[in-house]
Amino acid sequence: MNGKLQSSDVKNETPYNIPLLINENVISSGISLISLWHTYADEHYRVIWPRDKKKPLIANSWVAVYTVQGCGKILLKNGEQITLHGNCIIFLKPMDIHSYHCEGLVWEQYWMEFTPTSMMDIPVGQQSVIYNGEIYNQELTEVAELITSPEAIKNNLAVAFLTKIIYQWICLMYADGKKDPQRRQIEKLIATLHASLQQRWSVADMAATIPCSEAWLRRLFLRYTGKTPKEYYLDARLDLALSLLKQQGNSVGEVADTLNFFDSFHFSKAFKHKFGYAPSAVLKNTDQHPTDASPHN
């Protein structure tokens, strides 16, 4: 609103007219989205570029890889290997990528290739841990629905939505450069946990990797993740369990054994407490709606 505010008869209303931007223009780059993949992969998933690439490599494009859960590995042409755990984000230049594959039981990720419409300051090769992964997971689900809509205006909204998310990730990466050593220690531990969810971790085991007391580890986890170490580890195992149950051929007992739960009863109880339904319900739904877990880029 410009000019003067009209007077109001409401006594407790505080009038204001604050110029949030007035002295200069702000120009923000958009993106041209080349491809967007939502991949849920098992241990057989491996992609080699350019052999398996559906579209030609574009020199000025970028690849953003957002790992939802599990573990994946990207091999660059210079021999560098990048291991990705859920939840994390990384930006890479597609011309640098040699291959990528699932490292472990499952790798769920969003793989997006895009070109900025103007200058975009993107940190290349820098991994950032995403603590509020549920928010991004939901937003990317919305993007997937919009981008597959037959309505062009919804496709445009999907790309605008994705541009907003990309800028959030870039801002997060620049903030990461200023983070304290304690947060780096927790992120390193979180990466280790996600890489070995089949292992039975006690809070004492986790604290020993820092090293610190169990009480101090609890305080750090609550500060950075909003969960205790035990809650975080259990949630990560249950999220992976849900994905494994969606894979055809995995029984409830096999998933419980794979993720080192005491037995199927304790696994089912924890699963239902988190998701609100029994693990057997996932198997029934998967049998009715089989999905392809290995799309290629």
From Swiss-Prot:
This is Uncharacterized HTH-type transcriptional regulator YidL. It comes from Escherichia coli (strain K12). It comes from the Bacteria. Residues 187-285 form the HTH araC/xylS-type domain. It holds the Pfam family AraC_binding. Residues 204-225, 252-275 bind DNA. PANTHER family: ARAC-FAMILY TRANSCRIPTIONAL REGULATOR (PTHR43280), TRANSCRIPTIONAL REGULATORY PROTEIN (PTHR43280:SF31). Keywords: DNA-binding, Transcription, Transcription regulation. GO terms for molecular function: DNA-binding transcription factor activity; sequence-specific DNA binding.
